């Protein structure tokens, strides 16, 4: 199917009617299930834009999106009315994607709660009755497993409540889990023995270790970083040279970054003085080698 948004005659007449509030109100009063209808104050119908729908979906939709206030005035419900003049097998999943996009748009407006979005498919194709399931979970190879996965709470790995002894048994992921669990601890020295044990097992490569140490420098207690590395190195002689090499590499990178940041700050100070003395903008740029975006910060 090509990504064309050109409406068919079927789509055009459908939208002409459904874009009219009075017509849409009658449609919803007649076709919404009673429990849902009772939740909606249909006198508050408001036509919503659909430009937020991702580009890959727009070609497939002849959609109408209405919002209504709830009967108690405490929230909103959205009704997606989709038109089809021929049956399409994966329509349920597309409607689900549309519904979640509408939910996201609602939250982007600043609302905390996720709104109900009611998808309705209006169908008048040659094949009758409509031949496909409109439960999107039926589109999976294993619908029963899909129901179990998507109608229950999602899986959670809350490492904050996993005992350290249990984490130590997690093979190649143990070091990451242990460090991230304790990264906010005031002093990581107490973790040295466990970390050393994990390093001796040989599950961590140099790239991972350097990234992990850099993470400790950025998010942990930097004042104790050197002692932390030295303690680990002393407890694992076979890893000592490797650990100290990585630590030194990080220090050099840190010095280089600090030097570059210092030079940049100095250039900004020079630019500020030049601008104050009336130098042309182009001369300031050429002299300091700052980018054009840096100059406004100098005013």
UniProtKB/Swiss-Prot annotation:
GO terms for molecular function: double-stranded DNA endonuclease activity. This is Inactive recombination-promoting nuclease-like protein RpnE. The gene is yfaD. GO terms for biological process: DNA recombination. Belongs to the Rpn/YhgA-like nuclease family. It comes from the Bacteria. InterPro entries: Rpn/YhgA-like_nuclease, RpnA, Transposase_31. Pfam families: Transposase_31. Upon expression has no effect on RecA-independent DNA recombination, cell viability or DNA damage.
